[in-house]
């Protein structure tokens, strides 16, 4: 797969366009190779290999299978990043108003991460805290985790996600794996289907993807 910058004006051979945006285009570069049984990998094997590589690079594997565990992990990671512990009422209010507000969608959540990852939050005791969702100045303080096969049944349809990267507990990256011989476009279609059917479900944390 090649990402071709559409602004640069460079010409390229005729490729099959998968996705096209205002600043970049994703194309399929190489034709599907002839099947080689000795090199065949199932999607499960690809998934295991990817996770093993990420763990070797310092990612922590997170055994998270439901939203309650996802939220509990998010709280722990944000508390560790900021060096203090929320009381339960403070966390509930922070989560519901600044992380997973019912009125927020993909645009608002993307803007929060991209433009305002530090939130001024007043605790119940009157103390004002600058709560970071992401530390841009000291990137190695951020927590990186990987989880797989997260299942959701609260959306329009039941879905199970291949691999998710958590940054400080927030699901920011989704990876959909396809075995050799399957068109790459199918992975993009599947992610788009998740956006329609289930990323918004529950508290909508997967809308941060």
Regions found by a protein language model. Name each.
Residues 2-209:
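An alpha-helical interface "stripe"
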């Amino acid at each position: 797969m090649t990402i071709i910058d559409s602004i640069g004006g460079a010409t390229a051979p005729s490729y099959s366009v998968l996705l096209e945006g205002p600043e970049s285009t994703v194309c399929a570069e190489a034709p599907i190779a002839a099947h080689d049984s000795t090199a065949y990998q199932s999607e499960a094997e690809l998934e295991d290999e990817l996770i093993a590589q990420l763990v070797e690079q310092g990612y922590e594997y997170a055994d998270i299978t439901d939203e309650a565990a996802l939220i509990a992990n998010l709280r722990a990671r944000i508390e560790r990043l900021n060096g203090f512990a929320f009381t339960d009422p403070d966390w509930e209010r922070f989560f519901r108003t600044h992380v997973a507000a019912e009125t927020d969608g993909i645009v608002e959540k993307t803007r929060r991460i991209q433009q305002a990852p530090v939130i001024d939050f007043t605790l119940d005791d009157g103390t004002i805290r600058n709560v970071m969702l992401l530390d841009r100045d000291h990137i190695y303080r951020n927590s990186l985790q990987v989880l797989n096969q997260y299942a959701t049944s609260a959306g329009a349809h039941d879905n199970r996600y291949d691999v998710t990267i958590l940054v400080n507990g927030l699901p920011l990256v989704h990876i959909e794996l396809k075995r050799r011989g399957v068109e790459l476009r199918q992975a993009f279609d599947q992610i788009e289907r998740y956006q329609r059917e289930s990323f918004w479900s529950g508290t909508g944390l997967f809308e941060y993807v």
